[in-house]
Amino acid sequence: MVLVDTSVWVGFLREGDSLLSDLLNEGEVLTHPFIIGELRLGNISKRQHFLSLINDLPQATQATEDEVTHLIEKNKLYGKGIGYIDAHLLASSIMSVSPLWTLDKRLDAISKKCKPPIG
C-alpha cells in the first residue's frame, strides 16, 4: 500500500499517471482525510464522481496531535520547509507502514529518512 499525496493526485487529474492507475487497479492506494480535504478545494472535472471514488479508498492510520508533535521533535523537522499537514501525512505513512508518494522534493527527502513517531 502507498499513501498518495495531493501533489501526485493533482498531476494524475491533469495529465494522468499510469503508475497511479496501476496501483489503483491493484487496490494498493491509501488516502487520508487531509488529502481528500485538499483535493476538495481544487477545481476538479467530474468532481462528485471523483470525490466519491477517492472517499471509498482505504485510509491510512491517522496520527494524533501528540504523535505528530513527537515525530517533529524526534526527527528535528522544524525549519525543514514542510508544513504541518505534511508532518501529519508523514506520521500517518510511517504508522501505516506505507511509503508516502509525493512530488514535493523536500517532503520526499524527509520521508526517506524519518524515524517512527513513537518508539
Set out the residue ranges of the language-model regions.
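Short, well-structured N-terminal submotif of metal-dependent ribonuclease cores
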Residues: M1-T31, R40-S52, P117
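A generic structural signal for short hydrophobic patches within well-formed alpha-helices
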Residues: W9, I36-L39, L107-D108
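Active-site neighborhoods of divalent-metal-dependent phosphate/nucleic-acid chemistry enzymes
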Residues: F12, S18, A60-G119
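Structured helix-beta-strand junction loops
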Residues: E26-G27, L53-L57, S96, C114
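A general structural signal for well-ordered alpha-helical segments in protein cores
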Residues: H32, I36, R47-F50, E65-T69, ...
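Short, acidic/turn-prone active-site loops that include or flank metal/cofactor-
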Residues: F34-I36, D56-P58, R106
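Generic short alpha-helical segment signal, independent of protein family or function
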Residues: I44, N55, E73-K76
